Amino acid sequence: MKALWAVLVVTLLAGCLAEGDPELEPEVTDQLGWQTNQPWEQALGRFWDYLRWVQTLSDQVQQELQTSQVTQELTVLMEDTMTELKAYKKELEEQMGPMAEETRARLAKEVQAAQSRLGADMEDLRNRLGLYRNEVQTMLGQSTEELRARLTTHLRKLRKRLMRDAEDLQKRLAVYKAGAREGAERGVGAIRERLGPLVEQGRQRTANLGAGAAQPLRERAQALGARIRGRLEEVGNQARDRLEEVREQMEEVRAKVEEQAQQMRLQAEIFQTRLKGWFEPLVEDMQRQWANLMEKIQASVATNPIPPSSVPQESQ
């Protein structure tokens, strides 16, 4: 916080000195007074370099000043600078951590004011060059030395003001960035301070709950284990009873099958005996008839012998 206030004081003092008597301001150097690290600073550097070239009022500059070439170039460079500046400011706003709303609003307002002053300075430079072009066009064929002298004086003053406002904007952006970083660090510290006691309370509560609930949990676990063992024993007994019942049913089935097989064997033997009783008399009768037939045939052959057959001889 001390660092933030120190930067604010330095910025305010610089602004007060810059708003003093213009005659006391030092001559503007040819280069910007800081390193162009940020894109908006680089864009402003290109604007500054082009303006320095215009201030030389060389023959080429004099020729281009009579057209809209210079003002168009300055317009493009000015728009590039403002675009990059807005992007950098938005980036800082996104990085802003927890900070008092009043401080945030004040810093944003100061940066916006400095940004507006810089834009107005660039606009004045462009308008002054446009005015010079109009004056030159109205004095065709006449000497323009006096116009060039006045333009040189105006450009010198405008460049001083541009440099002053650019440095002021850079300082305020530095304060804005420092405030964002310090606000974020302070916010993290405040969050840590608020959460620290809560975390400690939660840790103690967890420890107390663990110590107080250990015994009931152990008893509940033992009771649950006993119920599970009882259920397992009950299921085991039921399984054994069921197995014994199935074994007895299998024995009954086997006995019935053996009994039915014995009955079928007895019935087969009885049927075989009946068949034998049916066919044996028929067989004996057929054998007897066959024997009688053979005897009759033999007796007939014996009583009626067959005479030998005579074969006629062929004549010689």
Curated annotation (Swiss-Prot):
Q: Where is the signal peptide?
A: 1-18
PTMs per UniProt = APOE exists as multiple glycosylated and sialylated glycoforms within cells and in plasma. The extent of glycosylation and sialylation are tissue and context specific.
LDL and other lipoprotein receptors binding, as annotated region? 154-164
* Methionine sulfoxide: residues bearing it: 139
Cell compartments where the protein resides: Secreted; Secreted, Extracellular space; Secreted, Extracellular space, Extracellular matrix; Extracellular vesicle
Q: Which residues carry this modification: Phosphoserine?
A: 143
The superkingdom of the source organism is Eukaryota
Pfam families this protein is in? Answer: Apolipoprotein
* Repeat positions for sequence: 76-97, 98-119, 120-141, 142-163, 164-185, 186-207, 208-229, 230-251
SUPFAM superfamilies given for it?
Apolipoprotein A-I
Instruction: Enumerate the Gene Ontology biological process terms.
Output: acylglycerol homeostasis; cholesterol efflux; cholesterol metabolic process; lipoprotein metabolic process; melanosome organization; phospholipid efflux
The residues the record assigns to binding heparin are: 158-161, 225-232
Residue span of region Lipid-binding and lipoprotein association: 206-286
Q: Which GO terms describe its cellular component?
A: chylomicron; extracellular exosome; high-density lipoprotein particle; low-density lipoprotein particle; multivesicular body, internal vesicle; very-low-density lipoprotein particle
Disulfide topology: none
**Region called Homooligomerization, residue ranges:** 262-316
InterPro entries from the entry? ApoA_E, Apolipoprotein_A1/A4/E
Which parts of this chain are annotated as the region Specificity for association with VLDL? 274-286
What subunit structure does UniProt give?
A: Homotetramer. May interact with ABCA1; functionally associated with ABCA1 in the biogenesis of HDLs. May interact with APP/A4 amyloid-beta peptide; the interaction is extremely stable in vitro but its physiological significance is unclear. May interact with MAPT. May interact with MAP2. In the cerebrospinal fluid, interacts with secreted SORL1. Interacts with PMEL; this allows the loading of PMEL luminal fragment on ILVs to induce fibril nucleation.
Reported function: APOE is an apolipoprotein, a protein associating with lipid particles, that mainly functions in lipoprotein-mediated lipid transport between organs via the plasma and interstitial fluids. APOE is a core component of plasma lipoproteins and is involved in their production, conversion and clearance. Apolipoproteins are amphipathic molecules that interact both with lipids of the lipoprotein particle core and the aqueous environment of the plasma.
Family, per the entry? Belongs to the apolipoprotein A1/A4/E family.
Record-given protein name: Apolipoprotein E
Classification from the root reads:
Eukaryota, Metazoa, Chordata, Craniata, Vertebrata
